[in-house]
Amino acid sequence: MTRGARLRSDARAQLNQLSLDGGTGSGQKGKCEEFPSSLSSVSPGLEAAALLLAVTMDPLETPIKDGILYQQHVKFGKKCWRKVWALLYAGGPSGVARLESWEVRDGGLGAAGDRSAGPGRRGERRVIRLADCVSVLPADGESCPRDTGAFLLTTTERSHLLAAQHRQAWMGPICQLAFPGTGEASSGSTDAQSPKRGLVPMEENSIYSSWQEVGEFPVVVQRTEAATRCQLKGPALLVLGPDAIQLREAKGTQALYSWPYHFLRKFGSDKGVFSFEAGRRCHSGEGLFAFSTPCAPDLCRAVAGAIARQRERLPELTRPQPCPLPRATSLPSLDTPGELREMPPGPEPPTSRKMHLAEPGPQSLPLLLGPEPNDLASGLYASVCKRASGPPGNEHLYENLCVLEASPTLHGGEPEPHEGPGSRSPTTSPIYHNGQDLSWPGPANDSTLEAQYRRLLELDQVEGTGRPDPQAGFKAKLVTLLSRERRKGPAPCDRP
């Protein structure tokens, strides 16, 4: 029998005894006034019975833990610790699970002392409902009173920073009442005690995987065009091997189809369905196969991991050897880009072929070769190259009259064969002969147009014999015309 029931039974027994001994004490007002002597004899017993009834009807809750705590509060902008007497109550028919605190003052420390001291002496009462508790964690970084440990009790409304001499002795019961069903204290308190248990420190496994290397996944074949062609339907077992995916019967070990990983075009999972697209080289032929399974994401990750491992074993499939480009050194020796050589006039050997450089490219790429030019063009380019490499001469409009003349003599003193009016020389026939220096005298001599063409006429008379008279007459008229222009103004080449 509990204490409350026992007190109630004792109170009822005393009341019955009092009613039997003093029958006149019925409790009515009129009778009490008529028999005052009987009232005086019954009053002490009634007072004792009333006190027992008050105790039995309002029994005191017994806390599961009580003691001194320190609670942090802010006073005038400064954090202070207040010493309180804490009472931890469990939930029951008479109240909810809560943590009550009374400020400790002079006149009493315990709950009984505080009650007898009165409201002015026991201080303010604070209640924290454990049903509103969110977390209970140790607060090692907080400064707290000496020989105490701080812990943070967070509720839905605010956070309470408490400190106790034995922190875990308070955190454990609070967590058991605030988080029923967990069976243990919060993770923070467990972590706080883990170094004290002497556990061996462990390291994380970097290659840990939650799925098996060779997994078997029960699936249901979805209806697709490829599945209908292969006559696949109903439940089956999808087995992931090191090199291929096998489809087996649901209640047997016979393999129905096999799809090598390197023959799969695509694969993926979406909303509980794993699907892949097989290539033409698969035994089932090309097409889309779909399988419904609750572990479709795990199946997709397993296939991706198997493909990655197979790629590591066969690096030559993913790393093709680069084909080196042919270098310019592997070709026949050519002239330096941008430089042309002058070929002496005369027939070329039939075995030698002259290559023409179209456009120089980078040194690491093969040179681009153009078509073989004709003899006239090669002589023209050679003449231009020679004139560009020498000192610049006077350029003017009338130097092109040399085209009408025959080619001068060669370096060896032998005259070149004369050209016919409608024929070309079989050898190189440059516009300006390379063997004759057409540069005029230096600045000390006369460099006017009239003097230059007179010099040209003298050379024609000395070197050329048998010239047609029309050309000589034409040149004479031209010299006369130029002399007239000279009198009118400076020649175009003399203008700045």
Curated annotation (Swiss-Prot):
Coiled coil: none annotated. Constitutively tyrosine-phosphorylated. On IL2 stimulation, phosphorylated on C-terminal tyrosine residues possibly by Src kinases. Can also be phosphorylated by ABL1 kinase. The keyword Membrane applies. DOK proteins are enzymatically inert adaptor or scaffolding proteins. They provide a docking platform for the assembly of multimolecular signaling complexes. DOK3 is a negative regulator of JNK signaling in B-cells through interaction with INPP5D/SHIP1. May modulate ABL1 function. One of its GO terms (biological process) is Ras protein signal transduction. Residues 213-317 form the IRS-type PTB domain. It comes from the Eukaryota. GO terms for cellular component: cytoplasm; ficolin-1-rich granule membrane; plasma membrane; secretory granule membrane. The gene is DOK3. Belongs to the DOK family. Type A subfamily. Expressed in spleen. It is found in: Cytoplasm; Cell membrane. Residues 63-179 form the PH domain. PTB domain mediates receptor interaction. It is a peripheral membrane protein. The modification Phosphoserine is found at residues 194, 330, 364, 425. This is Docking protein 3. Residues 18-38, 313-363, 408-447 are annotated as: Disordered.
